[in-house]
Amino acid sequence: MEPEREGTERHPRKVRKRRQAPNKLVGAAEAMKASWDLEESQPEAKKARLSTILFTDNCEVTHDQLCELLKYAVLGKSNVPKPSWCQLFHQNHLNNVVVFVLQGMSQLHFYRFYLEFGCLRKAFRHKFRLPPPSSDFLADIVGLQTKQRVGDLPKTMEGPLPSNAKATINLQNDPIIQKYGCKKVGLTRCLLTKEEMRTFHFPLQGFPECENFLLTKCNGSIADNSPLFGLDCEMCLTSKGRELTRISLVAEGGCCVMDELVKPENKILDYLTSFSGITKKILNPVTTKLKDVQRQLKALLPPDAVLVGHSLDLDLRALKMIHPYVIDTSLLYVREQGRRFKLKFLAKAILGKDIQCPDRLGHDATEDARIILELAQYFLKYGPKKIAELNLEALANHQEIQAAGQEPRNTTEILQHPNTSVLECLDSVGQKLLFLTRETDAGELASSRNCQTIKCLSNKEVLEQARVEIPLFPFSIVQFSFKAFSPILTEEMNKRMRIKWTEISTVYAGPFSKNCNLRALKRLFKSFGPVQSMTFVLETRQPHLCIQYEVLEAAQLAIESLDGILVDGTCIKVQRPVTELTLDCETLVNELEGDSENQGSIYLFGVSETFKEQLLQEPRLFLGLGAVILPKDLKNGKQKKYCFLKFKSFGSAQRALNILTGKDWKLKGRHALTPRHLHAWLRGLPPESRRPAGLRVVPPPFEQEALQTLKLDHPKIAAWRWGRKIGKLYNSLCPGTLCLILLPGTKSTHGSLSGLGLMGIKEEEESTISGL
C-alpha cells in the first residue's frame, strides 16, 4: 500500500481582526493599519496566505522569530502566540510545512549568483535576511533547548490504556459525532461530497491536471444498497514521479476480483519495496500497462459502484482515473484537528486484525483492500456512536507515547512555556517531524524525540527521498549541504558585490557643450534620486557627467528619462559604465524588476515629510496599499526624499504610479528594482570606491579554472542546478503547503556571512514555475 499521509487539514476557525501591524525599514518603514484590517477581513479568502509585507527591523528575522512562525503553523493562535514579524492568515487551512535548508550558502551566495537562482526567486514573494548561524542552526530554528537533549528524556511508560479513559469521553466533542451525529447513517451519508473531494485533492473532471485522466463511467443512481469495492494500489518512484505497480480490488464478501501487477511507462528510480513489496525481480516479467488495468477496471465496476480506499485520492491519481462515488476511511473515521488514523491502527483497534507486519516485505495490497472494505462496513453496521465510544484518539495517543518512549505530559503546560520547541508542538497533536539530511550533517535534531530521521549519502539521494517522503509527513525539514566559500573567495565576493552595485547605480551622461549650465544639469540629474557623488569627466573631447546614485532605481530612471534627449542642441547618451561586472546589467535589471518580491512595489523620489499623511487623505486613489516604506538617513535619522510603496497587486501599483507621477503630485518614480531586504543590506555595507576606468577585477585562478571547465561542483553551476531541482520539488508540493528555503549563512574565525530566507505558500492556482 502507498505510504500513508497524516494530513493536517483542519476545520476553519473564525479569524479576529488585527489592530495594528507595525512595519520598519531601518527603523523608518511604516505599515498602513487600514489596509491590513481590510486584508484580514476579506470574507472570500478561504486559503492560507501570508501578509504582503514582513514587519522586521532591517528586514532581518532572528532564529527565534523563525521558530515562532513554525510553531504557529503547527498549532494556530489558540495554543501559541502569533509570530511577531509576519501575518499568517487562515493557518487552519495549511496542509503541510516544508523547510529546505541549503547548508553552506548565504545571502552573499544568493546575490552573487542571482541570475542562476531564477527558479527560487521567482517562486517566492517573501525574502528576508538571517543572522549568521550558531553551531547548530537547525536546533535554533526548531527551538531545541539544552535541557531537551536525548540523554535527559523521561523513561518509557509501559502498560495498557488507563482504565479511566472511557469514563472521560465526552461524546458530543468527538469529531465523528460532530460530523455524523449519534444515529446510524446510510452509505450515501458516508460518500465524500464534490466539495470535500476538491478539498482533499481527489482527481475531478474539468481540472487542468486531470485532462488525461479516464472516467470510470459509473454514473448510475446511488442508494444505501449500492455495491462497495475496496481498492488499494502500490506505487513506485519513476523519473516522472509516482506510477502504479499493483492494483487490488475486493468486492463485498471479501472476494478479490482484480489483482494485477503493472509495468510503469517511465524509468524506475525506486521500487519503494519497504512499502509496496514490489521488487525489480517481481516486476521484470510483467507486461501489463496502465491502460490495460484502466480498461479492466471500467469493465468490472457497475454503474452505481462505490470505491472505498484509505487516502484514496493517491490511488486514483496513480490510476489516472476519475470516479464520482468514493468513501475514504482515513476521512470517514474523523480524527481531531484534521489528522488521520493510519490503516494499520484502525485494523487493530476496530477489527482486531494485524496487518503490515514488520516481518513481511512491504504491504499486501489485497489484504489492505479487504481491511479497508471491512472498516467501511463496520462503520455502516454499528454507527458513529459505537466508534466514538472506542475513544480512538486516546488509544492512538497512548500508542504514540509508548512508541516515543516517554511519559504522558501536561500538553497545556508545555505549550504555554516560552521555550516550547516545534517538536513538542507536533508531539502535542500526535504528529512527527521528518528530517532528511546527509549522514555527515545530521546534528542534534537527528537524535531528537519525535523526529523521523533519514540519513543519505549525497544531496542527490536527499532529493530523491524528499520526493517520496514529504507527502507523508505534516512537517518536513530537508537539508542539503554545499561547500562554503573559502575566506579568500568570500572576501573577493564581498568586494565584487559592493563594486558591482556601485557601478550599476552609476551613469555617465554626455557629451555636453563647454558652455552648458552646470547647475541646471546637476538639478536635473538629482531629480531622479539621492546622489552619492557627481563629477565632471574632462578626459573626453567634450565634457561628460558621472553620477553615482544611492539606489539602483534612480540610475535606471535617469537612463530611461534622459538617454537620447537634446541638451543645448546636442543629443546626449546616458549609460552605465561598461565593465566585466556590468556586462549583464540589462539582464540583471530586467530580472530584478520581475522578482516576485518586487511585484506590486514602486519607487518614488521627491517625497516630503508629510507624504504619508497626504496618502492617507486619499485612500480611494490608492486601493490595495499595504505599506509605506520611508528610509531614514543612517547618520542623522532624518527622512530621505525617496520611498517605496508596497501594493497587493501589480495593477494597483501601476495605477498609483500613474497618479503619483502625474501633474498633481509631480513625483518621479518607477517600479521597484531592489528587494526590500537587499536594499537594507546594501545600505549597511561599508562603502567601496569605484574602480578607475579600465581596472579589471581578475577572479582567483582556481575560480577562473572552474568556470572554464564548468565543473558541476562550482558554486555558480551548483546554484543553477540545485535552484532548478528544488524549484521543481517545490512545484510538486500539494496546495496549501507553507514552504521556507533557508540559506543559513556561515560563521567562522575568518568572519561571518548573513543568511537569507525565502518563504511562500504553495497555492492551487499557482502556475508552474517558469523555466523548469
Curated annotation (Swiss-Prot):
PROSITE patterns: RRM. Residues 1-10 have a biased composition (Basic and acidic residues). Pfam families: RNase_T, RRM_1. Residues 228-376 form the Exonuclease domain. The keyword RNA-binding applies. Residues 11-21 have a biased composition (Basic residues). Its EC number is 3.1.-.-. Residues 505-579, 600-679 form the RRM domain. It comes from the Eukaryota. Keywords: Exonuclease, Hydrolase, Nuclease, Repeat, RNA-binding. Residues 1-26 are annotated as: Disordered. One of its GO terms (molecular function) is exonuclease activity. CDD domains: REX1_like. GO terms for cellular component: nucleus. InterPro entries: Exonuclease_RNaseT/DNA_pol3, Nucleotide-bd_a/b_plait_sf, RBD_domain_sf, REX1-like_exo, REXO1/3/4-like, RNaseH-like_sf, RNaseH_sf, RRM_dom. SMART domains: EXOIII, RRM. The keyword Repeat applies. This is RNA exonuclease 5. It comes from Macaca fascicularis (Crab-eating macaque).
